[in-house]
Amino acid sequence: MVPSSETATVRVLCQKLLLSPNHPGTLQWLIGSPFFPPFTVVSTFRCIHHSPDFQQESDDLRKLLPKGFEVIGGLIIGDSDAEKSAFEAVRAARRLRKHLSEGGELDDEKIVGASCDVGTGTIHFFISKSENTTKLEPVGSVVYEDKSGKYLWENGCLLHCELPIKLPFYYPASSPSDSKEKFSDAIDAVITQFKEPYVVYIAETLKKASGGVPKPVVLRGKDLGFGADASNINRLPSADQVSDIKMLSCSHLCLNNKTAPAVNSAENADKIHISVLLNRSEKLPTSGAPVAEYFPAMEEARLIVVDLNLDVLTYAPKDLPLMHAVSNLVIPALVDQLYSLKKIILPHLLVEHPQLRIYHFNPPGVLHPITSMYELNYGETEMKQVDVRKLLHLRLGLPLDRPLLRIANALDLSVNDDSKSNMNRRGSTLLKDVHIGIPSSGVSEGVASIIQGSYEYYHYLQDGFDDSGWGCAYRSLQTIISWFRLQHYTSISVPSHREIQQTLVEIGDKDPSFVGSREWIGAIELSFVLDKLLGVSCKIMNFRSGSELPEKCRELAMHFENQGTPIMIGGGVLAYTLLGVDYDEGSGDCAFLILDPHYTGSEDHKKIVNGGWCGWKKAVDSKGKSFFLHNKFYNLLLPQRPNMV
């Protein structure tokens, strides 16, 4: 039962509710789920087709938003008349919902309307009880939830279905214009088959584990219930209490691994794979002979075969019956995607078809996955693809200076094996993000500014290569390049010492005899290699003494806030990787988060942290010992994040 507006609570799960707080008139769609309590805002999308163009907006959101989520309201950044702005947002949200339903029946549901005062930044929430009322009711309270990802994924799972289709159809050679109608008829025939009694849906877990894996569940088209309201479907308390296989819940295929880390993102959520098969050979009550029908063409005809690669992702609560998850989430998602592909292909039906590929992403700040179609006829760096990604960044409120929706960023929905480790190209295990979980810095009133994203820890003696005493800067460079790889700025492999040396020879910085030597390199050489291999520019800071480094803590903090890249520190014959600073602006007290490439042991996180090979270092420790030597010159290499999407 939906609560009255006087007692209603708006729950905000998304971390970033305002995508463009300084742009009056901006309209955002509030996204919720029929499976969550009423008025729960999971995410928000910016309206990018202005006036707005509801048809274009609905086309985009139908492709972008997984089934299991829906538009529950709107938010406008407006003036001081909060209720007036909120009413405009409600009216727009209701119109969008009608377009998304494509003429289907919509209940006169309560809609959330919100307005943000552009001057103060205050957000006011209201509830619209009915489409026919012009009065809004203020909500009782607004709660901004912590650990919202945990709430989403501990109680829910993803259903993934891939379905490649080769769709042949004929059209009269004398009437090419009829091809569009014939193609549409072929699409409709496929959609009809999804609900046929002889269609079989096989559901199986999409994640391997060391323990037992549940057996796949077979669901037949004749057993599915279509058209049910997802929010009113009876939930199931436990798979163990269900004897009818048709009423098994999604939790039956979810892994209850108590030793696994907390599930707080789509990447490590439980996933169920759905396969679609046709079972035309089901046992018949009477025997019969095979029959073939022949329909001669009345005139010359042409054959077209269209390749359609469907790939849908949906969200379901774990206590939802699998039968309803397939019939009310997966199948409608397949139908919507077929229609979306049809719209794109129709203008090119008689020429070269666009090579469409569907990818799923879970960008930072968005709690749930989103889906996008890319044309592979165009390379990722071509302007048409860049413009597509820019619009997606704008809609989702993502920064426009980093690649978050490239193909390399896509979710990997293949079968995962938790026992496998990250392996580098030479077969040795590389540790990632070793600074996570280390003790605090000891700067009592400090503000920590640290690296953004992930990196791999490179250090002495890895890969069986003895670089002890001379390879620390090479290892720091490898860590930096691994950061650019893991943030998907590049796909090149992390170079070996020899490849780094060869690069410096190729640009004319070193003689050919340098290749294979044990000579040191410094910040200047690292900047040359980053420019040559990645096209990355660098800023270099020079210090006459290590005692000067604490004076630049504020500037270093700004680097980590704005650029977020690892910094190489070179002093004397030693090199380190700087991952962050903790700085108290009042007292000037500071600490440096150092990743030390001089470590020579095994890939043991506990040993590395306990040995101080990754940790916070004060410029002068409690015993009066200086970490940065006063009698040595220091150079800091600050790689600049490329401005790209």
Swiss-Prot record:
Which GO BP terms sit in this record? proteolysis
Q: Main EC class of this protein? A: hydrolase
Residues that the record marks as modified (N-acetylmethionine) are M1
A Gene Ontology molecular function term for this protein is: cysteine-type peptidase activity
Could you tell me the superkingdom of the organism this chain comes from?
Eukaryota
Which keywords label this protein? Acetylation, Hydrolase, Protease, Thiol protease, Ubl conjugation pathway
Which residues are catalytic?
C472, D596, H598
According to the UniProt entry, what is the EC number of this protein? 3.4.22.-
User: What is the purpose of this protein?
Assistant: Thiol protease which recognizes and hydrolyzes the peptide bond at the C-terminal Gly of UFM1, a ubiquitin-like modifier protein bound to a number of target proteins.
Family to which the UniProt record says this protein belongs = Belongs to the peptidase C78 family.
What's the protein here called? Probable Ufm1-specific protease
**What organism, scientifically named, is this protein from?**
Arabidopsis thaliana (Mouse-ear cress)
